[in-house]
């Protein structure tokens, strides 16, 4: 997993820093658009930037890990052709390499909550449970899609579209209270609904 991270950014001047710069810029841009542009207010007693980042950071991990793990067999096709190589570890390597970045952002987010004067509470330990559940979900989905993409290469592009729709259909930038009760069950079919909530 460590080697995968190095390889991904090997030809760039900033190297692994790009793994952190892109999500930060995305968060700042969305925050500016929604809070400054659309004047979104704080959610309860939680500043909007914290509420928003709490949903977007898990989504970053979910989408990046699933997308990269899906393409792992085609990306490392030179290894797949080796008979003695254990192919099944490739999607797992991609998930773990994305997990390193996710852990950094979760720690950074916790620090931000403390800086904003929000004291740690016992229920913050739920982060461990939901992170584990999300990792298991990504690994399960990745084994399915990584197998299918070998036979249907367009799946990688289709997944990009699905993940775009998924981000907007998950209550990350909007509150779930906006949805009428009769449609709530549809949104609860999305596993990431429970993580970002």
Residue ranges and their predicted role:
Residues 2-197:
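Hydrophobic transmembrane alpha-helices and immediately adjacent juxtamembrane helices
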């Amino acid at each position: 997993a460590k080697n995968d991270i190095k390889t991904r950014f090997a030809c760039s001047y900033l190297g692994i820093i790009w793994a952190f710069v892109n999500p930060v810029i995305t968060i700042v841009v969305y925050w500016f658009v929604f809070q400054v542009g659309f004047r979104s207010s704080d959610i309860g007693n939680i500043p909007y930037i914290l509420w928003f980042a709490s949903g977007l950071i898990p989504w970053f991990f979910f989408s990046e890990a699933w997308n990269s793990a899906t393409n792992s067999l085609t990306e490392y096709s030179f290894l797949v052709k080796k008979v003695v190589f254990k192919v099944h570890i490739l999607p797992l390597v991609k998930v773990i390499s994305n997990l390193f970045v996710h852990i950094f952002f979760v720690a950074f987010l916790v620090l931000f909550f403390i800086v904003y004067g929000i004291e740690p509470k016992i229920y913050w330990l739920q982060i461990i449970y939901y992170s584990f559940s999300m990792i298991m979900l990504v690994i399960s989905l990745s084994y399915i899609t990584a197998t299918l993409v070998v036979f249907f290469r367009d799946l990688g592009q289709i997944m990009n579209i699905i993940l775009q729709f998924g981000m907007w259909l998950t209550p990350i930038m909007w509150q779930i209270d906006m949805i009428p009760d009769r449609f709530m069950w549809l949104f609860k079919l999305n596993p990431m609904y429970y993580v970002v909530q």
